[in-house]
Amino acid sequence: MRVLALALVIVALGPTTAPTGEISLRIVNVITPQDVKIWEPPSVFAKKGDSVALKLINRLDAEHGYEIAAFGVKEVVDGGKTKEVKFTADKAGVFPIKCQLHPAHVVGQLVVLE
């Protein structure tokens, strides 16, 4: 199976295409009164049947989770560490991405197209 050339979307800029291979995501601190943290980019796009490889980079001190429940993805990335996640996007739809450790402040979505 081929590794998807994922398109990453930053809402204000619209879709952009990434080179074929692994996609890097990082946890970032958004300065707000609630000290919100998000995975960036928050949206990941794939096609049904594609193999997806995500590189999760946590440059913050605290551990953070990364969960896409619909695909059995559930990782904890320790502070200052990196983890790789691989799965097959075997169903189409929009699926929530959250931090299972801090669900109130880390959200995103995986969009799998037919």
Show where each model-derived region lies:
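Non-catalytic surface loops within mature trypsin-like serine protease
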Residues: 29, 58, 70, 89-91, ...
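Histidine- and aromatic-enriched segments that form or immediately flank copper-ligand environments
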Residues: 59-81, 109
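Extracellular/periplasmic metallocenter environments
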Residues: 18-19, 23-24, 77-114
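N-terminal post-signal-peptidase region of extra-cytosolic proteins
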Residues: 34-43, 68-71, 80, 84
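Sec-dependent N-terminal signal peptides
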Residues: 4-13
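Non-cytosolic beta-sheet module surface loops
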Residues: 56-58, 101
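Residues within well-ordered beta-strands of beta-sheet-rich folds
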Residues: 53-55, 86
